[in-house]
Amino acid sequence: VSGAPSDSDFGTYEYEEHRKVDLFPVYDQNNGWQEILPALAEPAVLTGDVTCDYVVIGGGYSGLAAARRLAELEPGASIVLIDGDRIGNNAAGRSSGFAIDHAHNLRARSFADARAQAQAAIAMNRAGLDYLDQTIAEHNIDCGWVREGKYHAAATDRGERMLGHFAESLDAIDEDYTTLDAAACAHVFGTSFYTKAIHAPHSYLVQPAAMVRGLATSLPENVSLFEDSMVTDVAYGTRMHTVKTERGSASAPILVMATNGFTEGFGFLQKQLIPLITWGSMTRELTPDESDRLGGDPSYGIIAAHPAGTSVRRVTTPDNRILVRNIFSFSKRSDFVTRRHWAAKTHRKSFENRWPKLAAVPFEHSWGGALSLSRNGEPVFGELRPNVYGTVVHNGVGIARGTISGKLLAEMIVGEDSDLLHQMQAKGRPNTNLPFQDLGVRINARARRLIAGLEE
């Protein structure tokens, strides 16, 4: 690799390939979920040279689950988990906090034709939610984790037609749901904006930054977590792999990549991932008078009927706020700062369309969060090269699918077997992206916004 470090930079092990990592997450400090929590203690930063049994790169849902499961299955093993930021400020702590059992976009007519495939995907996601539910309960993690389900809501005729397709899809796979008319929507949401909704009961809502912070602090004792430790170089070997950070290194015979859209920077999956940033804004805490004027339920999550519409959370953990999330942008390098104000202007319009009586309530935080898609919707799971394993690209179902894929990857590494593992291994691989991918994403995003209309 051009410009790569030499063997002498990595110590005494023999390596087949050295690589300078050339793609990094760059996050600002305006993640509302993180900022409304108590300040973190100073992190443990990787310093010096560490040798262990496993190195896991990436402290999101997949990395946390993989590290935990490796530690559970091999209590005598030493596991190093490395993240380039603080847990909670990374991508895992920047989502809307929908821990879903089936994808939001089951609206397609063709979905009902793939009954067995859809039911298998839902079972896989629910296994991830069950593992999280068990872990959160066992360690008493305070993160607002509650099985409230999710609402899919429409505000236009087009949106109502999409809800009809969604209901047909749910009927075809024997999934239960409840339909709300306009009056019921107003009663639940505190606004007359929505004309119809479907409530799917099996998803969870969560404060994502609080959850991943709790998952990190409750890791087994044989997991060493290092934060603010960006991996800058990697050496792949026949016997050992070594990763370097600014102040240290970690070497292990087995390397686990839980790096999602940044995996390209480590030399894998070139031109196969679509890196996006989705944007959200959160109000300041509502006053008692504002809450009374708003009415509605104190906590809920809304997914727009149209895929390009606005997601909404009314949040009570740790306090009373409203979050709106819409629009996405293409970015390999997590350029959050320059586009944050652009996103906030769009969110302000969406917020005031829904709650004009709260027009004076300002946003306190606006931020972006990275996610990764593949063009054909397939994930990456398994061995990327000898003794380098990866679970990457969860296509918008990161909390559930990222968790179960990290758990299953750990089980695969140590030789555990299960039907779920076979299902994961049987999945396809991402196909190659089309030329001018970034331009295509931008055109697609603009077209979707225009079609979404009032539902944005």
Give a label for each model feature:
Residues A71-R94:
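Glycine-rich FAD pyrophosphate-binding loop
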Residues G58-S62, G84:
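Glycine-rich Rossmann-fold phosphate-binding loop(s) that bind the pyrophosphate
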Residues N90, R94-M124:
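Glycine-rich active-site loop/strand segments that organize a redox cofactor
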Residues G3, F330-R449:
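C-terminal catalytic lobe of FAD-dependent flavoproteins
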Residues G3-Q29, N105-S110, Q134-G214:
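Flavin (FAD/FMN) cofactor-binding and adjacent substrate-gating region
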Residues V1-Y54, E72-L73, A77-S78:
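Extreme N-terminal leader/targeting segments of oxidoreductases
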Residues R161, E168, F193-P253:
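Helical element adjacent to the flavin cofactor pocket in flavoenzyme catalytic cores
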Residues E138-V146, V231-D233, T238-H241, S249-D289, ...:
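Active-site substrate-recognition segment that forms the wall
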